[in-house]
Amino acid sequence: MARVKGGTVTRKRRKRILKLAKGYRGAKHIQFKVAKDQVMKSYLYAFRDRRRRKSDFRRLWIARINAAARINDISYSQLMHGLKLANVDVNRKMLADLAVNDADAFKALVDTAKKALA
C-alpha cells in the first residue's frame, strides 16, 4: 500500500493558522509552532476581554456621570439615589451620554434628583 503523506491537508491547516497570525510581531507571524500558540492565546484574550469590556464601559460611564454631577454640586451616589427616589428610570449609558452631549438635560435630571432628596 502506498504511503499517504497528507501534504495538502497539513499545508491548508498551517496556512489557516498563519493567516490568523497576520500582523503579529517577530516569529509569531512566520513560524507555525509559535504562531499556533499565539493564536490560541489571542482567542483566550478575546474571550476574556469580551466579558471585561462590559465592566470597562460601565466604569467609564460612572466616571463621566460623576464628573458632570460634581460640576452641578452633587456626588454620583447622591445623584443615583435621588433619581431612584424620583422614579426616573435612566440607565448609566444614557446618563453619561446626556452628561457629555446635552448638559441642559443632564442639569434637569440633577435638579429632579435634588428635589427628591430634599
Swiss-Prot record:
One of its GO terms (cellular component) is ribonucleoprotein complex. GO terms for molecular function: rRNA binding; structural constituent of ribosome. The keyword Acetylation does not apply. Gene3D superfamilies: 6.10.160.10, Ribosomal protein L20. Keywords: Ribonucleoprotein, Ribosomal protein, RNA-binding, rRNA-binding. Pfam families: Ribosomal_L20 (PF00453). It comes from the Bacteria. One of its GO terms (biological process) is translation. PANTHER family: 39S RIBOSOMAL PROTEIN L20 (PTHR10986). Belongs to the bacterial ribosomal protein bL20 family. Binds directly to 23S ribosomal RNA and is necessary for the in vitro assembly process of the 50S ribosomal subunit. It is not involved in the protein synthesizing functions of that subunit. This is Large ribosomal subunit protein bL20. It comes from Lactiplantibacillus plantarum (strain ATCC BAA-793 / NCIMB 8826 / WCFS1) (Lactobacillus plantarum). The gene is rplT.
